């Protein structure tokens, strides 16, 4: 083999390895979806200045809940955040880097960013509430921003969910 063939083979192997190592949306779902949603809120002028992106991200984080709020905490987008790697988000976004690549860089800085996963949604029209754990019943109510005053038994939580079900779920026609 001559030198050019060896170089070509090396480049091919490196290219295949990079493709295999590339982050997929499922590997880092909360990061990718949150970065995409945030990037979609930015106007053209803001996208060019990483300082403005950081300021907008902090505003964006104030409205987030659950997993997205935890993501903001890890990056330093919340006032109570212990660390701050916000520039690892803002600078790549100012260069129009795709969300997957941004999250790949963030994962190298802090691996727990990609450990965040969305909870599986419970299909209330098809699930038997009696078979769920109390923890899951409480989570359903919490997701609806509802509480169950005086609920002690599982049957109390089920009764409350059944009362609220028409308000929060749509039945398919």
Curated annotation (Swiss-Prot):
Transmembrane segments: none
Disulfide bonds: 28-114, 31-103, 61-72, 148-151
Signal peptide: 1-22
Keywords: Developmental protein, Disulfide bond, Secreted, Signal
Predominant localisation class: secreted
Highest taxon in the source lineage: Eukaryota
Protein name listed in UniProt: Mesencephalic astrocyte-derived neurotrophic factor homolog
Organism whose genome encodes this protein: Drosophila grimshawi
Gene (name only): Manf
